[in-house]
Amino acid sequence: MAPGCKSELRNVTNSHSNQPSNEGDAIKVFVRIRPAEEGARSADGEQSFCLSVLSQTTLRLHSNPDPKTFVFDYVAGMDTTQESVFSTVAKSIVESCMSGYNGTIFAYGQTGSGKTFTMMGPSDSDNFSHNLRGIIPRSFEYLFSLIDREKEKAGAGKSFLCKCSFIEVYNEQIYDLLDSASVGLYLREHIKKGVFVVGAVEQAVTSAAETYQVLSRGWRNRRVASTSMNRESSRSHAVFTITIESMEKSSETVNIRTSLLNLVDLAGSERQKDTHAEGMRLKEAGNINRSLSCLGQVITALVDVGNGKQRHICYRDSKLTFLLRDSLGGNAKTAIIANVHPGSRCFGETLSTLNFAQRAKLIKNKAVVNEDTQGNVSQLQAEVKRLKEQLSQFTSGQITPESLLARDKEKTNYIEYFLEAMLFFKKSEQEKKSLIEKITQLEDLTLKKEKFIQSNKMIVKFREDQIMRLERLHKEGRGSFLPEEQDRLLSELRDEVQTLREHVEHHPRLAKYAMENHSLREENRRLKLLAPVKRAHEIDAQSIARLEKAFAEVSSTETNDKGLQGFSPKALKESSFFTNTEKLKAQLLQIQTELNNSKQEYEEFKELTRKKQLELESELQSLQKANLNLENLLEATKVCKRQEVSQLNKLHAETLKIITTPTKAYQLCSRLVPKSSPEVGSFGFLCTESSSRLDNDILNEPVPPEMSEQALEAVSEELRTVQEQLSVLQVKLDEEERKNLKLQQNVDKLEHHSTQMQELFSSERSDWTKQQQEHVTQLSDLEKQLQDAQTKNEFLKCEVHDLRIVLNSADKELSLVKLEYSTFKENHEKELSQLSERHVQVQLQLDNARLENEKLLESQACLQDSYDNLQEVMKFEIDQLSKNLQNCKQENETLKSDLHNLVELFEAEKERNNKLSLQFEEDKENSSKEILKVLETVRQEKQKEMAKCEKQMAKIQKLEESLLATENVISSLEKSRESDKELVTNLMNQIQELRISIGEKSETIATLKQELQDINCKYNASLADKEESKELIRRQEVDILELKETLRLRILSEDIERDMLCEDLAHATEQLNMLTEASKKHSGLLQSAQEELTRKEALIQELQHKLNQEKEEVEQKKNEFSLKMRQLEHVMGSATEYPQSPKTPPHFQAHLAKLLETQEQEIEDGRASKTSLQHLVTKLNEDREVKNAEILRMKDQLCEMENLRLESQQLREKNWLLQRQLDDVKRQQESGDQSHPDSQQLKNEHEEIIKERLAKNKLIEEMLKMKTNLEEVQSALHSKEKACHRMSEEIERTRTLESRAFQEKEQLRSKLEEMYEERERTFLEMEMLKKQLEFLAEENGKLVGHQNLHQKIQYVVRLKKENIRLTEETEKLRAENLFLKEKKKEF
């Protein structure tokens, strides 16, 4: 910047509002054009500019042959004020920092383009209070005003901590400006903090004034120096960082937000030929240009990465780019101010700055809120649970406002239909993808099979060719082989051919694939024929049709309901859709698993039912047979019983007869004799003789009665034993019959099963017979083939000998081939190892070549950019020089014409002199004295003319010298152009050499790629044998993974179902609790709500009255302001009507000062009204807290009433029990069964019951009263809730009014700042006008003193020209003033 330009940079008002763009987190680029200095005017009074502003977002660069147009986010002209720049650029960044985002603002441009003035302001005054202060002081003011506003709104629940650090990057070293004793600091990187400076001082600040003190203290330590382009040129990059930490407490949780605001003043790029830097300044300029070129390379790489290219971003090549890494391509919102110089001599730097800004505009960052939540773990868990429940309630549609319930109910069906349609669409897409994958796999499988079959066919063909060759050899040399050898050879070869054919035709994988394919087709056909699958398809088709119909209806009705807006915000809708989709996905997985399980269960059930049906049929037939057998047995048993009864009757009659006959008695007697005399046993012979003699005597004797009784007893005992034995045998017989029945049933089952098996066997026998017949036919065919083979064998036996010889030779060749193959395999393995090593080396070389190629491309791009800039600069300078040359030629022509006129005057004077001399000679004699006088006057005039001629000749010599100087300048410019051409040719040669080297390297890369492809082909060929086994393993792994996946899905579906059930249970319990709490709340807010309503209504009326008063005052102030502006316009108009007056109106300055004082007083009044409104809002908040406490107290009272209600219920139950006991006692008294003490006890109990009944009646009355009170409280609570809702709406409205008033206040403040800047500008212009008037007064005095008429005329003409110029300037200023007033009226 030229000397003194930083302090003399003037701006005028530009009424652009701060309209944030909706381009996400893209880097915002703003261009500011600095005004040209006063010394940059040409000879004709006009300035030579290379820029022109077309609109607020576009500017034009006057390049040759065609001008270039650039588009940016905002273009600030030469008359833009500091306040408009701040409101456009920095306000949104500061507000985002208050919201928790990182923000960065930095100025870029050449040296002397106004970067420091834009960021800081004038350098020779107090920047913090100056009207022309820059972005950094204004950012401090706005930041702390926002902090104070947040503190007033939140009270003690929110606190802020601001810390400042100030560093500079000087000669690629980092220094701390707040610590003058610091040496080179280091940069470090942290995962959360990002890039930071180790050891930098951070100072806490609490106000904008403290922050500015820290800034000014560090600014004094910054390195600045003077150059030919700027009086105070920044020699380092300065970064001022403000760390903003906000801590918000809510119950037991603490929400912490941290953000960084980086304010960067970059050093300007410069050229040595412009700044004439030497020594240390030249080294500093080299480091500055190097860091700025690294910044340009980083931005180019970021643009390429944003366009999808793979590029390395060289952040670490410079300390500046590494420090600004997050600001350029990370977590920050960034604004770049590109400062440019409009002068034509800065065309090259202006063009490079605009190209840099245009590239930076394409970068997009990803800014996020830096937020951390701390607090009690249980409290956080409860908060998370509450939010989840609220989210579930929102998604389920339970929490909806009363005004939108109907619309939400109408939309639920549409949402469900839409989600189902999306699920069907996703399902169809997934099925389509799976089918496409299966098709591709099957195609790959068929290709592999075809390749395998072709290879095997080729092997068979080679073998057959070998056999044909051996046959031909055998025919040529018939009889050389023995018949046994020929047979053996032929049989071996035939066997080999047959095995190969079988290998081709009956490959196990082919058979496996065919079987799998067939089974899959059968399974698919069977599943399609199942009734559930058909039903599912039909249901899907019906649901799709229903969804399409519903979607059409909703889409038709949605156009009619566009005016209505949903209550739930977009985030809630998205969350509800997300949760619904998750639940529907889980349900879909569950239904799919259930479908698979039902299919499996259906198959198992089908098999079981078939088996059970067979068993039941067999059991039925066996039971039928058993039933018939049992009926037969029953009839047989009846017949047997009849026979047994008849036999028993007969036996009984016979026993009676036997008992009554004497033979029986005799037998009894004979049985009793040996019992009575046991000694007779030794004398058996004598007894027999005696018994034979006594037979007749015993028979004739009568039977004694004792013996008959004994005989009866013995018979009865024997009958009893027989009956017992009979009963035991009967039981055994029954058991045997049951066993026989069971066996018979089993036999029947087995017979039925055997019949079924026989039927199966018969069907199988028929099949077997058919197969046997087929085998017989095949056997006959095989016999025929055997006969043919025998004939062929006989034919081929003659060739066996030759084939054996050939086989021996083939074996020898095979052994040689095996040896060659082993050696080839070893060599191949060695080559593979070498090729793998070479592959690695080639890959490394390729990577190195790629990196070198990228570097060369980057350098080529940089050279191309510099070449283009040089071309543009050269064209622009050539154009300027050609214009200067034309001007010089025109001046030379004018000087030549003036010289010719002077020569003609000189000749005329000579002729006059000659005439006078002749006249003198003629009149010499007549009037010598007069002639002498005349001669003397002529001589004087001649001397004057000669002096004039000498002056003209001196002017001519000066003009010739200037012409020679211009010619020398032109020659030097031509030489510089030739040197530039030589530089351009050198650059072109370098580019050509680089292109040649790139071509050579690309050729080497191509050869390396070809070698790499050959190596890959060999490597792939060597690995082809391993792919089949890997494929089998992969398939097995895929099967295992599929089984695991199905198991995991089943487990997941069960877990999801369990979680859903748990959530439903928790939701139901929560709803129950909420209902109970709501009933409690509704019962306790009557009196407080009424008082609150009356108070709030009065307060609202008071606030509305004050608001109306404020609006009237604002309108009155606006009217006064417009009136004063009209007065100012009138004063300015009166000032411009008299441009030649040497004095200004005396009352103008005082009137303007009074006007500004009144405006300041009005602003102070507005601030006071704002503070009073804020106090009212705080009072309202305090009242609200008091009412919340009263609500809590009423809740406690409601809890007590609920406890009383429970106690009354318990007493009612006790009363009922006692009433029953009393009734029992009365019944007992009436019966009279109880004794006297019991009756006394009953009397006591009766008295107690009476007392309890009275107490119960009292409690019932109190309960009824409480119920009535509760109903009244509930009704009052309902009305109070409505009032509270109205109050909350009123509070929201007051908040919006407060925010609107804050915005209006900020707009008024910015307008006031612009007015201050305009006042400064008008004061400066008035001073200039005063100086001009004083100068005119002096010149007027001089004009009065002049006596020569020619001089007076020239002076008056010059004054008229000056007067015309001044009137034109005043007209321009008046037009600008009118334009600004119209803009203000629009606001």
Curated annotation (Swiss-Prot):
InterPro entries documented for this protein: HMMR_C (IPR031794), KIF15/KIN-12 (IPR044986), Kinesin_motor_dom (IPR001752), Kinesin_motor_dom_sf (IPR036961), P-loop_NTPase (IPR027417)
The GO terms this record gives for MF are:
ATP binding; microtubule binding; plus-end-directed microtubule motor activity
According to UniProt, the tissues expressing it are described as:
Expressed in brain (neurons in the external germinal layer of the cerebellum and in ventricular zones) (at protein level). Expressed in spleen and testis.
All copies of domain Kinesin motor, residue ranges: 26-363
Task: Locate the Phosphoserine modifications and list their residues.
Answer: 568, 1141, 1169
Among the record's GO biological process terms, what is one? Answer: centrosome separation
GO CC, alphabetical: cytoplasm; microtubule; spindle pole
Q: According to its UniProt record, where is this protein located?
A: Cytoplasm; Cytoplasm, Cytoskeleton, Spindle
Q: Which UniProt keywords apply?
A: Acetylation, ATP-binding, Coiled coil, Cytoplasm, Cytoskeleton, Microtubule, Motor protein, Nucleotide-binding, Phosphoprotein
Q: Which Gene3D superfamilies match?
A: Kinesin motor domain (3.40.850.10)
For this chain, the family text in UniProt reads: Belongs to the TRAFAC class myosin-kinesin ATPase superfamily. Kinesin family. KLP2 subfamily.
Subunit and interaction comment:
Interacts with MKI67 and TPX2.
Q: What is this protein called?
A: Kinesin-like protein KIF15
What organism is the protein native to? Answer: Mus musculus
Please spell out the taxonomic lineage of the organism that makes this protein.
Eukaryota, Metazoa, Chordata, Craniata, Vertebrata
